Amino acid sequence: IANRHPRVNIHQPGPGVGGYCIPVASAFLAAGTDVSTPTINGARRVNSIQPKRTADQLFELLTGITNPVVAVLGVAYKGNVGDARATPADTIIERLEKSGATVKVHDPLSINSRHNLVSLESALEDANAVMFITDHDQFKQIDPTTAAKLMSGRIVFDGRNILPLKPWQEAGFTVTRLGDGTTHSAT
């Protein structure tokens, strides 16, 4: 039942849940009742640390790179929408910047991002790594060979498990997928 809504896929790993309705709705459901909500509270706690963990995972992949440049693709809180309210991308970007990375952000749909958005080409240019935070359909169509020509590094962090693995590996990228526990080396 939980995964039947056409706009959600709650069983898919990701960098955190965003948007304005989940934090408000879960608090609203519990407010004014004597009902204990340990599951909701636990889920909110896990969700609050997931963006930090995601940023830290990418930064581990950048070990040994001085002044790393990261292309962050997607700031909307979910795929194929432009809404960037309460997005996990904000925490991820801030944490990467505090760790010393230069972050270039691209989102073709975002209407209310607090970040300076650039074109896809500008985001990828000279980047050591590209991090997919939002699962926009457009991102699935990015040509890995073109990305390789623009980037200085070959690190992909797929935070939504949306990329076809083989073409990215064949273009020389090492791909880490959030939630599958492995890093897939270039072929």
What are these regions (language model features)?
Residues 1-187:
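Structural/interface elements that position substrates and couple domains in central-metabolism enzymes
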